[in-house]
UniProtKB/Swiss-Prot annotation:
Fe cation binds at residues 112, 155, 159. This is Peptide deformylase. Disulfide bonds: none annotated. Removes the formyl group from the N-terminal Met of newly synthesized proteins. Requires at least a dipeptide for an efficient rate of reaction. N-terminal L-methionine is a prerequisite for activity but the enzyme has broad specificity at other positions. Its cofactor is Fe(2+). The active site is at residue 156. The gene is def. Belongs to the polypeptide deformylase family.
């Protein structure tokens, strides 16, 4: 079971590396890692389990965050209360194959399980993306995402490219927003 102590923090060089593509069929080790990362997200979103194990809630966890430099991220974006998740999958070798010109940012900024401090500011992202990835069975998927799920996937893909969310924040004026950028509440 992945715990907070297993998640590496900013300053660890693995977080700044470009992760290696994953080959199929998955090794037993990679299959276990995928399952463990998704279990962490499920546990982190369950208030009882999260409190018991002192887990910070997360909607995404990339392999580099557990010190494994591979192109694999678990994503679990919850749906409205009592409904199925909006997005739940382990995305392997993901690629954004198209995106909107329209940018968006979360009003409250972004956070990260590998960053133990608040970094205020807007993180400009594409509002809509088309994502191609493989699941744990090697099946290719092409999905269109917008708003929050699109932002989550871009954050996770950044981890696979050695980029942290605060790299995107305007250093001079963290809350500067182009007129046409959507601010998502």
């Amino acid at each position: 079971m992945i715990l907070m102590k297993d998640i590496i923090r900013e300053g660890n060089p693995t977080l700044r590396e470009i992760a290696q593509p994953v080959s199929f069929p998955l090794s037993d080790e990679d299959r276990q890692l995928a399952a463990d990362m998704m279990t962490f997200l499920e546990n982190s979103q369950d208030p009882e389990i999260a409190a018991k194990y002192q887990l910070r809630a997360g909607v995404g966890l990339a392999a580099p965050q557990v010190d494994v430099s591979k192109q694999m991220s678990a994503v679990l974006v919850p749906g409205p209360e009592g409904e199925a998740p909006i997005l739940k999958d382990v995305i392997i070798n993901p690629k954004i194959i198209s995106h909107s010109v329209q940018d968006a940012a979360l009003a409250e900024g972004e956070g990260c399980l590998s960053v133990d401090r608040e970094v205020p500011g807007y993180v400009p992202r594409h509002d809509r993306i088309t994502l191609r990835y493989q699941d744990v069975e090697g099946v290719s998927h092409k999905i269109r995402l917008k708003n929050y799920p699109a932002i989550v996937c871009q954050h996770e893909i950044d981890h696979l490219n050695g980029i942290l969310f605060f790299d995107h924040i305007n250093k001079e004026n963290p809350f500067a927003a182009p007129d046409d950028m959507i601010i998502l509440e």
